[in-house]
């Protein structure tokens, strides 16, 4: 005996003004009696503050009361019997009904401290002497088309320069003073380019970079995507920045004065439109990280390359993500 949910869309993406449609599939070897089949839709913003992202006072809050977005239960079938074999029961529920005073439908997002999740649950109640049947499935919510920008936005580009003088952390001596080459000391490095500062969630982060000069050979250049989650706690704000994704742009030393394209696909469930709500906010950053060849770096292969280190040079820029039609 089993129960399963099958939604009408394989990608499980729905908009608040649309109906969530699908089938409840029940398989049983013999007919069973039940006291009703109920479908429950739930959506909420779940927040927590971990010890590493807040001080002692903030960490006392722990898990914060969720912000409810959607909570609705409907009876799909009254009490009765389910015949043996496979039974399919269709359902259709509009997510946002007219006249309802609901919280804003934020887009689905799974972060470190903030999670925006929508679930559909079905229960087949069978009384005290029999085990009830139940199953839950997550569906994804995206903004209504009426709330989106009318046309795709061209990606806004920002120009960046990465040199030894733009770094706020300590660097290896050879990166600053250079190396000795035929009795001449060649020093420093300079990388310039441009990258998206605003882009659509349906498109990539794009841009280009050029290594103009580098006294020390380059090991790799990575494009890193970060999320910045902020939660309001009383009069304070707890903020945590965490790495979402790393995309390698180059591997090995790079030819100088050669234009290298930047093209990064955004992960669906780990990103959402840049959001500024009252109790929380979700922002994003993009970093260009240059790793230079160094014996010291070989001893720290397992460390997070997003953290400033002696053999790394980086530039971090804000990134606004938007949903377009």
Go through each PLM region and give its residues.
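C-terminal beta-sandwich interaction modules and adjacent acidic
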Residues: 1-325
